[in-house]
A protein has these predicted regions:
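Nudix hydrolase/Nudix homology domain
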Residues: 7-12, 44, 84-97, 129-134, ...
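Acidic, metal-coordinating catalytic segment for phosphate/diphosphate chemistry
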Residues: 21-67, 73-77
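Conserved Nudix-box catalytic region and its N-terminal flanking loop in Nudix hydrolases
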Residues: 67-112
Length: 209
């Protein structure tokens, strides 16, 4: 693990009362304002063990038409808790130098995407929500800003730190569900779950008649 200063925010500043659990789409802008106002930069090794702080992680999903980019982490991943896991998200820690020259978290997110992924098409970015999961040691010290990158090209491949990647439909991704990292499972359940989508479509169709 690198000994670098990363962006963190005190838990009590993010959650003055009870912390929500899961992926929440509402209130994203308010939390971003808190992050910008209360952000600190502290040594990563210390923060991995300090639950008084949340490490802010932009977590980017790539989508092309009806397919999402599913990746598998290397067994040599720097965080041993995530090795060999499958992931829907591209992300990482933010350092002080990453946010220089007036750059935003979103600017950093696009740079991080292009550092890890070889992709030459156009991208449209949108915010899906904030993800919090205190049910395990990894999630307890991290907070995810979940972003969706929609591309106009299917030509995409892994550049660094991740082992493999492929574009799959939600139904195909479901086969890997047990091996998805926890954040990706939460996102799958909230957004991609084909059974949930099918029920919503059936409900919408029945309301037409």
């Amino acid at each position: 693990m690198k000994n670098e200063n990363i962006l963190v925010v005190k838990r009590e500043k993010l959650f003055p009362e009870t912390a929500f659990q899961g992926l929440v789409a509402s209130g994203t802008q308010a939390l971003l304002e808190i992050i910008n106002r209360e952000k600190e930069f502290k040594p990563r090794p210390l923060m991995e063990e300090d639950s008084a702080y949340k490490q802010i992680i932009p977590y980017l999903l790539f989508k092309y038409q009806d397919r999402y980019f599913l990746m598998q982490r290397k067994s040599t991943n720097t965080d041993q808790r995530l090795k060999n896991k499958y992931s829907l998200g591209i992300g990482g820690h933010m350092r002080q130098e990453d946010l220089g020259n007036g750059d935003s978290i979103f600017d950093w997110g696009k740079r991080e995407f292009h550092e890890e992924i070889a992709y030459s098409g156009n991208l449209k970015m949108s915010t899906l929500g904030i993800l919090n999961d205190d049910s395990n040691p990894v999630g307890h010290v991290h907070l995810g800003l979940v972003l969706l990158l929609e591309g106009d090209s299917e030509h995409i491949k892994i550049r660094s730190e991740l082992k493999s990647g492929q574009l799959l439909t939600a139904l195909e991704i479901q086969k890997f569900y047990a091996d998805l990292e926890t954040w990706s499972q939460i996102i799958f359940d909230a957004i991609l779950n084909p059974l949930k989508t099918e029920k919503a479509n059936q409900k919408q169709s029945s309301s037409v008649y």
